[in-house]
Amino acid sequence: MLSRLIISIFIIFETIYLQIFKPVNKTFKQGEAKLKRTLQTLQSRELSEIRKRAISTLCLIFLIRIGTFLPIPGTALNFDLESFQQNNSRNELANILNLLSGGAFLEIGFFTLGILPYMNASFFLQVLTKILPSLERFQKEQEEIAQREFKKWTRYLTVIWAFIQSIVISWIWIRPYALNWDFFLGLKVVVALTLGAVIVMIIAEQITEIGLTNGSSLLIFINIIARIPNSIEQLFNSNINWTFPMISSLILSLSLSFITMFVIIGLQESGRPVPVLIARQEAERQKFNEPITEAERRKTQAYIFFQLLPAGIMPVIFASTIFDLALPAFTNFLLQQGNWGYQLIKSFPFNSLFKDFCYLITIMLFSSNYALTIMINPKTLAENLNSMNALIPGVRPGSETKVYSEQLIHRLNFIGSFVLALVCILPSIVERSLGLPKLQILSPVSISIALGVAVDTTRRITSYLGSSSPFKRDSSKREPLKRDFSKRRSAN
């Protein structure tokens, strides 16, 4: 009896060891091997390149944040800054400009204009290239020269646009709060703001060249992130009755913002892969009568990936520029009180479902036009496939491929832009319905830009890591394809 009990206990412990401790030991060994590969990667050339780019990016961002709070030289004592901040802290237009400039607008800092003039100039030149066939032809035929020329033209346009914006801000925003305003003080402010925008442009270009991601997008991302503490302080300092229903409403609003983040990431990463047949590969298979399974065909299959949202977050930025910047500026500054135009614009319910509907339509229209003019050209796609002797199965080369890709882009873009617009207007609808204070940091444009930069930075870091990353699958352990053209040739 005792021997049976001892044998049973031994069997139980052996089972526990085989089922629990042995797999855990194996997992520890695998983790140790992965850690060694990670340490090897830390010493690799690719990660060394990432470290250099990351350090360069952080140093340039540090310069931007310092310049954000530097006052305009020689003008610190000539402005009633406290009154300027109090009167404009509840102005929606001023809050948006302050958000995109990282707090420099309400501080009347050296970098008040921020990166907006450079982004406007780049976008204007992109649209102009697609509108004028001569510019598009010049860009295709002389790519390197065109790239240098476009870069130069973008800088010139940035200076012109920054000068115009500086005049508007100086004479409309700053002048009423100046203690001793004269022409020379205004000229000094205009020159300082223009120079600040040029310095921001240079830093953004350097981040793009030696940093981790696009400099313009990264600077706006940093400015948005920098306003998070102020937005939280604004929320708690507002006159809110912190009851259970209000706390529940706030949690619901935050949950909708997180849902917006996940949906935007999904839209940016989703799409439809379309298989492409390359004539040379098919000819080799037919020449050697090579049998191929469906699994092997999937591994070697070439695809064209049509994104669900080819225009990205640009439609949201464009719509926000119209309804949050252009219209308020036009209403508040270009029209006089009591004018019939002022009363007409004021009669439109821009803070209701009508604005949300206009927002949705604008995003969808701009997304459709931007996708076909800036991002993807179906005619160029068809010409490239034809030059590579490739075709889409079931679609003839040439005009049919152009029509097919056009229709596919329209369908995917309609779905993606509609979902994007719906997700962007949903938080504002909930805020108005529940009476929550509006936080600029949780606005659709803020979330879209932040996530767009995060996704782009992740892609670039992954591309820099390359094949040396220990987290990628080891291609040497995959089963090789059952193809050997050399043996077939020798046999023949």
Swiss-Prot record:
Keywords: Cyanelle, Membrane, Plastid, Plastid inner membrane, Protein transport, Thylakoid, Translocation, Transmembrane, Transmembrane helix, Transport. Residues 468-492 are annotated as: Disordered. The lineage of its organism: Eukaryota, Glaucocystophyceae, Cyanophoraceae, Cyanophora. It comes from Cyanophora paradoxa. The gene is secY. The chain crosses the membrane at residues 1-21, 54-74, 96-116, 159-179, 183-203, 206-226, 247-267, 303-323, 357-377, 409-429, 435-455. Component of the Sec protein translocase complex, which is composed of at least SecY and SecE. This is Protein translocase subunit SecY. Belongs to the SecY/SEC61-alpha family. One of its GO terms (biological process) is protein transport.
